[in-house]
Swiss-Prot record:
Is involved in L-lactate degradation and allows cells to grow with lactate as the sole carbon source. InterPro entries: Cys_rich_dom, LutA. It holds the Pfam family CCG. GO terms for cellular component: cytosol. This is Lactate utilization protein A. GO terms for biological process: lactate metabolic process. Belongs to the LutA/YkgE family. GO terms for molecular function: oxidoreductase activity.
Length: 239
């Protein structure tokens, strides 16, 4: 099975270990990984900021880059969601809407692909400690991926998963929201950190690097001792 990896901007620039872990997990599960070097941003920041025409140019480039893939997998619920929004963005342009739908139909978030396509619930990972899961907004509310991360983590040897209080609440990142609405964003992430600390977890695990960078940065500034990990890193653990 050939998987074309969309690595995302944040992974490429800040969290390269997440990209490496994603590839290694999928390869162990029998996937052949392709990485198109022509890939760029999915266009979400520009689109959400109202720069629709600029965003469309990035989206067209991504459609051209990925439309011949067998499966498209990304370690980001938010970016996967954006791919699924492409047909809506191009709804008034039948030619591009058709090509966008072709891409959207074969785009999966990392854990969604493992559970729903590969039909795997145990990847053989092991990690000792207590964890809690942050469920990112786009991934759960728009993409509809709610259970796959928990299913996979429940089978990680040595890991106990505790429910995160107020799990439905946003962490305050929201891409450009955290820049435009900084005071509100700071209050939201403080509330999220309080919820994490309430669980007594050793690890905070999530599937979107934006959320994890936001929460992790606040945890570090507050001097809390919780390790923040992307779920790909956890599923690649052998400890």
């Amino acid at each position: 099975m050939k998987v074309t990896l969309f690595v995302t901007c944040l992974v490429d620039m800040f969290e390269t270990n997440v990209g490496k872990a994603t590839v290694e997990v999928l390869e162990r599960l029998g996937c052949e990984i392709e990485f198109p070097e022509a890939q760029v941003c999915c266009g979400q920041p520009a689109y959400n900021s109202g720069h629709v025409e600029a965003a469309k140019e990035a989206m067209k480039h991504m459609i051209e880059t990925f439309e011949d893939a067998e499966y498209i997998v990304t370690p980001s619920g938010s970016c996967a969601t954006m791919f699924h929004e492409y047909p809506h963005v191009f709804k008034d342009d039948p030619k591009w809407a058709k090509r966008a739908q072709k891409v959207a139909d074969k785009t999966y978030e990392f854990t969604q692909f493992i559970v729903d396509v590969l039909k795997v619930t145990d990847v053989g990972a092991s990690l000792s400690g207590i964890a809690t899961i942050h469920k990112s907004c786009h991934m759960t509310r728009m993409l509809g991926v709610k259970e796959a991360p928990g299913i996979l983590l429940s089978n990680v040897k040595g890991l106990t998963v505790r429910d995160l209080p107020n799990v439905q609440n946003c962490c305050g990142f929201g891409g450009t929201f955290s820049v435009k609405m900084t005071p509100i964003s700071e209050q939201m992430v403080d509330e999220k950190v309080d919820s994490v600390m309430e669980t007594g977890a050793d690890y905070l695990i999530g599937a979107d690097c934006g959320c994890l960078l936001n929460i992790g940065g606040r945890i570090e500034r507050l001097g809390k001792e919780v390790k923040v990990m992307h779920i790909a890193e956890v599923l690649n653990s052998r400890s």
